Amino acid sequence: MLILISPAKTLDYQSPLPTTRYTLPELLDNSQQLIHEARKLTPPQISSLMRISDKLAGINAARFHDWQPDFTSENARQAILAFKGDVYTGLQAETFSEDDFDFAQQHLRMLSGLYGVLRPLDLMQPYRLEMGIRLENARGKDLYQFWGDIITNKLNEALAAQGDNVVINLASDEYFKSVKPKKLNAEIIKPVFLDEKNGKFKIISFYAKKARGLMSRFIIENRLTKPEQLTGFNSEGYFFDEASSSNGELVFKRYEQR
């Protein structure tokens, strides 16, 4: 079983690390090509392209400039510990045991605009390059054209290595669009998280993102290997709703706190 999650915009390169082990990203040659393109952008162009403030644009221009392919534990940190968005709040990788990291390294992948696919312990230098950004490059007009089949092929390699054909899609639509389902040698299961609001169940972005992290943690902590085991997920008040679910979609609901 291979779990897919999105990266985060918020990064943490200060907190203590629970493990000293690391691996290197497998698609760095591609990352270097994107860095070459990104370095051509001025801070105002970055601000416009990414729809971010001038201050953030300056920070990210400096990150592109400082990025270099020799990754060490001094200039980079493990991806699963560097990302700090809502998904990662639910995941809480900083509390993982070494055995948890082992399982995650085999069964969890982070999709990335710059790195393509990251394993949890892959070192990562700080960056901001969302998958949906229209960064022109030698392969096309955006990052989807740049990555082409590369991400899908890398996921197929991971599935083959574990002798499995199930992908748990906990990534956002923006990121999963970089995967080509018809070329993926897998059954795709998508957990959906609905929260009650004024008597109706709907996707509430903040809660849904955190729930994706909670589900990832549930799979890792319990060493789950079959999709039917996911129905036991009950973290923070969620419960499986079989009636609302279908073959490829597992629906989990949570009642409003009154």
UniProtKB/Swiss-Prot annotation:
GO BP annotations, alphabetical order: response to hydroperoxide
One GO location term (cellular component): cytosol
Family: Belongs to the UPF0246 family.
Upper taxonomic lineage: Bacteria, Pseudomonadati, Pseudomonadota, Gammaproteobacteria, Enterobacterales
Organism, scientific name: Escherichia coli (strain SMS-3-5 / SECEC)
Pfam families named among the record's database cross-references: H2O2_YaaD
Protein name: UPF0246 protein YaaA
